[in-house]
Curated annotation (Swiss-Prot):
Function: IGPS catalyzes the conversion of PRFAR and glutamine to IGP, AICAR and glutamate. The HisH subunit catalyzes the hydrolysis of glutamine to glutamate and ammonia as part of the synthesis of IGP and AICAR. The resulting ammonia molecule is channeled to the active site of HisF.
Subcellular location: Cytoplasm
Source species: Bdellovibrio bacteriovorus (strain ATCC 15356 / DSM 50701 / NCIMB 9529 / HD100)
Name assigned to this protein: Imidazole glycerol phosphate synthase subunit HisH
Ranges where the Glutamine amidotransferase type-1 domain occurs: 1-204
Subunit architecture: Heterodimer of HisH and HisF.
CDD domains for this protein: GATase1_IGP_Synthase
Assigned keywords, A-Z: Amino-acid biosynthesis, Cytoplasm, Glutamine amidotransferase, Histidine biosynthesis, Hydrolase, Lyase
NCBIfam families listed in its UniProt record: IMP_synth_hisH
Domain of life: Bacteria
EC number, as in UniProt: 4.3.2.10, 3.5.1.2
GO molecular function: glutaminase activity; imidazoleglycerol-phosphate synthase activity; lyase activity
Active site: C80, H186, E188
Metabolic or biological pathway: Amino-acid biosynthesis; L-histidine biosynthesis; L-histidine from 5-phospho-alpha-D-ribose 1-diphosphate: step 5/9
Length: 204
């Protein structure tokens, strides 16, 4: 069963509605007991990195989430700030991330040459898979997704990058490390492209 982690941040209902349209059952988990037994996990998130990490830590679900993902190797998909939470740390805050995909979250304007770039990066952008992955099955060419963010994932090792987009520089907009996946864009706002990606995740 796919379970969506509801720790108070993220457009939970949008994901539930999309999976309903795909005729794929999901459960919204608000407690550790509700999250237990998940065979796939979606970790959404919006807002600031530290606020998201603090809310997750306070939710009572951090321990079971760590156990499911790290011990039982349950596939997890972090979305938007949920992807950023997979990193070790962020320019945006002081709290440590989950550290499941080694890397740091950087602000576009902190990159030399991008000090004056408009933030946030908002709207549709091309997404180019850089390696073959089941997450992007059927999305290998001409895929476009909706973005809304001012920070991006800088992988410690380029092998963790699944797909890239360009906004002043080429950046990793999708990452993976074994059973851990993350996407910076919003599949729930990306129409057929997003539905395809969420269906693909259900089949990983």
């Amino acid at each position: 069963m796919i379970k969506i982690v509801d720790y108070g941040l993220g457009n939970i209902q949008a994901f539930a509605n999309l999976y309903k349209r795909l005729h794929i059952p999901v459960v919204v988990a608000r407690t550790a007991d509700e999250l237990a037994g998940a065979t796939k996990i979606i970790l959404p998130g919006v807002g600031a990195f530290d606020h998201a990490m603090a809310r997750l830590n306070e939710s009572g679900m951090r321990e079971i989430l760590e156990s499911l993902v790290q011990k039982d190797k349950v596939p997890v998909l972090g979305i938007c700030v949920g992807m950023q939470m997979l990193a070790n740390s962020s320019d945006e805050g002081v709290l440590p991330g989950l550290g499941w995909v080694p890397g740091r979250v950087r602000e576009f304007r902190n990159i030399p040459g991008l000090e004056g770039i408009a933030q946030p990066h908002m709207g549709w952008n091309d997404v180019k898979p850089v390696v073959s992955s089941g997450l992007f099955k059927g999305l290998e060419t001409d895929a476009r997704f909706y973005f809304l963010h001012s920070f991006f994932f800088e992988c410690q090792n380029p092998d963790y990058s699944l797909a890239s987009a360009n906004y002043g520089l080429e950046f990793s907009c999708a990452v993976a490390n074994r059973n851990v996946y993350g996407v910076q864009f919003h599949p729930e706002k990306s129409h057929d492209f997003g539905m395809t990606l969420l269906k693909n995740f259900s089949e990983i």
